[in-house]
């Protein structure tokens, strides 16, 4: 998985700071993981993905009052330094997430807050997809059908969802991701939050997962959720809850069909934010 920096030039070079902020917010809503304005009015945004993801992101920018100036692949280890919004605390339900630069970061944080180092497994809760899962997870924890759920985090990224679940329920959590770099980032965050005894993170392929889980968390692209629907159903216990996100409104119907119409899941609730959908399914 690659990181790309995309530089845009607004059509109106005299935009106010509020107008520039509006364009930056729109880019985040459309999937950018960070934005910066180093040489106003030029805006640089950052995305993660392969070349198809890059093409898809660029294709949806046609209605913005900007022209494309440059697209560059950037180092995954350096880009976060260019994005000040990465470091803002996030409140999601009863959870607070505080991004930090490293385990040596000694800034005070609210009691009980999750500390997350941004990295290849980007996931600090800033993006709507992650934030909605955290909110749903917080709500689930307030009135769980099982106070000690067996938890599986599919596509763990930075480990934020697995860490949150471990903190909320004090139960073991199995987390996987296909990216070795993401798992390294997740393990750093797991240690940072002192839940190494609860969370295991690995690159184990989904088809090799043998356990059964009553709570499944999956913040993935909607198309991937469709592809993995059989495996998600296979590892779910009867009555299991799945909180899924990363779904664009364009593919939501496909995800609903794959889980509810074809595999017997029941839609409990769906939420939308900035063009993204998060859903809670029960088996």
Locate predicted features.
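N-terminal auxiliary segments of SAM/dcSAM-dependent transferases
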Residues: 2-107
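Short structural boundary motif marking the start of a folded domain
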Residues: 2-4, 112, 277
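General small-molecule cofactor/ligand-binding pocket signal
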Residues: 36, 72, 98, 174, ...
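SAM-dependent Rossmann-like transferase core, predominantly class I methyltransferases
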Residues: 77-145
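S-adenosylmethionine
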Residues: 178-283
């Amino acid at each position: 998985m690659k990181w790309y920096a995309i530089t845009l030039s607004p059509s109106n070079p005299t935009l106010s700071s509020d107008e520039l902020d509006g364009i930056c917010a729109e880019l985040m809503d459309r999937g950018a993981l960070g934005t910066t304005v180093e040489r106003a009015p030029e805006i640089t945004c950052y995305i993660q993905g392969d070349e198809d993801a890059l093409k898809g992101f660029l294709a949806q920018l046609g209605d913005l009052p900007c022209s494309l100036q440059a697209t560059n692949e950037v180092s995954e280890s350096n880009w976060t330094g260019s994005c000040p919004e990465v470091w803002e605390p996030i409140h999601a339900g009863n959870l607070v997430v505080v991004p930090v630069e490293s385990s040596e970061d000694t800034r005070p944080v609210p009691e009980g807050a999750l500390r997350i180092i941004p990295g290849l497994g980007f996931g600090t809760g800033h993006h709507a997809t992650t934030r909605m899962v955290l909110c749903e997870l917080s709500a689930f924890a307030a009135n769980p059908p099982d106070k000690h759920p067996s938890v599986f985090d599919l596509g763990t990224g930075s480990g934020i969802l697995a860490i949150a679940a471990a903190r909320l329920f004090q139960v073991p959590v199995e987390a996987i991701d296909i990216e070795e770099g993401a798992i390294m980032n997740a393990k750093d965050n797991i240690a940072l939050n002192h839940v190494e005894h609860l969370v295991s993170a690995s690159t184990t392929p989904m088809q090799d997962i043998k356990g059964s889980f009553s709570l499944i968390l999956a913040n993935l692209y909607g198309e991937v959720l469709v592809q993995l629907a059989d495996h998600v159903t296979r590892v779910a216990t009867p009555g299991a809850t799945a909180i899924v996100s990363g779904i664009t409104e364009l593919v939501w119907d496909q995800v609903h069909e794959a889980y509810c119409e074809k595999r017997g899941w029941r839609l409990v609730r769906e939420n939308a934010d900035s063009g993204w959908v998060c859903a809670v399914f029960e088996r």
